[in-house]
């Protein structure tokens, strides 16, 4: 899997913005990507050193629209911790 295929988008929320002060950055990643692939992708794309990767899986939620029901997409979120002395990604 290519590095650009692993990372989908950065997650910008109040909680993730506060974590950026501690060099922790949050990304939506491909559901098939593992921690090693996420680490390699972040290091390759942003030219930084990664210390740790934590991954959270979100199950699809039930949704209804009138009489039709379905599910939202499942997603996978990665929290990437950078090593000391790395450059800020979004600042």
Swiss-Prot record:
GO annotations of cellular component type: ribonucleoprotein complex; ribosome
UniProt keyword annotation of Ribonucleoprotein present: yes
Signal peptide bounds: none
Keywords per UniProt: Ribonucleoprotein, Ribosomal protein, RNA-binding, rRNA-binding
Keyword Glycosyltransferase: no
Molecular-function GO terms, alphabetical: rRNA binding; structural constituent of ribosome
Any Pfam family: Ribosomal_L23
GO biological process: translation
PANTHER family named in the record: 60S RIBOSOMAL PROTEIN L23A
Family: Belongs to the universal ribosomal protein uL23 family.
Subunit (UniProt): Part of the 50S ribosomal subunit. Contacts protein L29, and trigger factor when it is bound to the ribosome.
HAMAP family noted in UniProt: Ribosomal_uL23_B
Function: One of the early assembly proteins it binds 23S rRNA. One of the proteins that surrounds the polypeptide exit tunnel on the outside of the ribosome. Forms the main docking site for trigger factor binding to the ribosome.
UniProt name for this protein: Large ribosomal subunit protein uL23
Source species taxonomy: Bacteria, Bacillati, Bacillota, Bacilli, Bacillales
């Amino acid at each position: 899997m290519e590095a650009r295929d692993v990372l989908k988008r950065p997650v910008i929320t109040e909680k993730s913005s506060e974590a950026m002060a501690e060099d922790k950055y949050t990304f939506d990643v491909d559901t098939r990507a593992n921690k090693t692939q996420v680490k390699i992708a972040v290091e390759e794309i942003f030219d930084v050193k990664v210390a740790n990767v934590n991954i959270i899986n979100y199950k699809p939620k039930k949704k209804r629209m009138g009489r039709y029901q379905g599910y939202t997409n499942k997603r996978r979120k990665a929290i990437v911790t950078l090593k000391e002395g790395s450059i800020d990604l979004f600042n």
